[in-house]
A protein has these predicted regions:
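Nucleic-acid substrate recognition interfaces
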Residues: 1-442
Length: 442
């Protein structure tokens, strides 16, 4: 499987014309968007992307054999060719997207707002190697960038963050790297390097697999269970970062008190800080989950399928929890694929509501929602019970999938609860695996 990872290296503060370069590149993209919007009917006839791009470039760039129709070269003289082509590609994509959205809007009887062609863009330039970007031979943590200083395009030596460069040298040496892209975050500039890897994913048969079932809860950040196909539990781990959550909840409390006094008009920066804390917490949880799975030589990491698309009603705290769950699953998926592990998702209905031993629904403690009481009086951790059920539902699905219909009907007759996936629990997996072994022995 091909995986693409990226890492941003901070540009140290120094007197280089980064802002001027960014402004002229965005101005060039805006100019090209206006040009191609006027003559899109001519370009739309050309279906081949490469031919369309060549035609678009000939319209704005003059050569010995071509006279441009528009004065783009006069407005942006001596712009590097690779940077000009990147701007052309960005402009073509913007206009094409606008035209497609406009057609869809007309087909839907003009429901919703009319699409707009936005020329004021947030495009970021790409520093192509050897043409726009060179590694500094004199300084280990330096590079040379071709920037616009207000008069022309010149080479400038820049210093990069030592810790960021050490990370790249340690973890990404020898990997295929793409051209770096300029990025601005929190009033700082970064060069984002992208790396491509070819990683073979595990192909272990289901009955020999070891999985890590993960329950992302509100009380504990994550509960991981290492499980085999017969239901044997090899390990359990509670992942929690209480200090980080306390810091975030203190910030949310300050936001709440501020909004009660002054309204919600001036809390944008405070919410941005809370979101950054939430994102950092998601990174730590995802790293802990994949690290624990790798320690136990796991083949598949199993999550609940969370229906978190669209608008979510409720308090901001709950929204932050849902944002973090989505972020954790995305990060875990990427990190697991880099390590050769697979990701699977199961139906989340009733995983926490039903006891893992098959005794029925659980009753959560009113004071501590992480603990619950089973119908038989047993006290247990609710998130741990849910992680057992998550792993069991994965194995029940994968064990029954390749079996012929007649054999599956016999098994479902002996274990009726596996017919409905939303009611399957850990005890059903143990019973199903035992019946499969008896059927095979017979």
């Amino acid at each position: 499987m091909r995986t693409v990872s990226s890492y941003g290296v901070e540009l140290r503060k120094q007197n280089i014309p980064i802002r001027q370069t960014l402004d002229i590149y965005r101005s060039a993209v805006s100019c090209l968007i206006e040009i191609y919007a006027q003559i899109w009917d001519e370009l739309a006839v050309i279906t081949e992307p490469k031919n369309r791009f060549n035609t678009a470039e000939h319209l704005v760039h003059t050569t010995k054999k071509n006279q441009a129709r528009f004065d783009f070269d006069l407005r942006f003289p001596k712009m590097p060719s690779y940077l000009r082509r990147a701007a052309i590609q960005h402009a073509l994509g913007s206009v094409s997207s606008y035209k497609t959205r406009m057609e869809l809007w007309k087909k839907t009887d003009q429901k919703g707002g009319r699409p707009k062609l936005v020329c004021d863009n947030h495009a970021m330039p790409v520093f192509y190697r050897d043409v726009m970007y060179r590694e500094d031979t004199e300084e280990k943590d330096g590079a040379c960038l071709k920037l616009y200083d207000g008069h022309g395009w010149k080479w400038f030596r820049v210093s990069l963050s030592h810790t960021d460069m050490e990370y790249l040298r340690k973890n990404w040496a020898g990997k295929k790297a793409a051209a770096p892209v300029l990025e601005k975050r929190h009033r700082k500039y970064f060069l984002r390097f992208s790396y491509t890897e070819e990683v073979p994913l595990t192909k272990t048969p289901v009955k020999e697999q070891i999985i890590c079932s993960v329950d992302l809860g509100l009380n504990t950040d994550a509960v991981c269970t290492i499980m085999r196909a017969d239901g044997t539990v090899l390990g359990r781990k509670f992942i929690d970062f209480p200090s980080e959550k306390d810091r975030m909840y203190r910030v949310l409390g300050r936001i709440s008190r501020f909004q009660r006094k002054h309204g919600s008009a001036q809390v944008k920066s405070r919410w941005a800080y809370a979101k950054r804390l939430n994102t950092e917490l998601g990174r730590k949880i995802a790293g802990a989950v994949t690290g624990y799975a790798e320690e136990n030589h796991v083949d598949v990491i199993v999550f609940e399928y969370l229906e978190i698309k669209g608008k979510i009603s409720g308090r901001k705290k709950q929204k932050l929890h849902l944002w973090r769950k989505r972020d954790i699953q995305k990060r875990c998926e990427h990190q697991a694929h880099r390590r050769g592990m697979r990701i699977s998702r199961i139906c989340a209905w009733n995983t926490s509501r039903l006891a893992y031993d098959g005794s029925g629904t659980v009753v959560r403690d009113p004071g501590n929602h992480s603990l619950c009481t089973f119908q038989n009086g047993k006290r247990y951790n609710c998130d741990l019970s849910a992680s057992y059920n998550i792993g069991a539902r994965y194995f029940i699905r994968e064990l029954l999938k390749p079996i012929p219909v007649t054999e599956r009907s016999l098994l479902e007759a002996k274990v009726p609860s596996v017919k409905r996936r939303i009611s399957c629990v850990y005890a059903d997996l143990r019973e199903l695996f035992l019946e499969m072994e008896l059927l095979r022995a017979a």
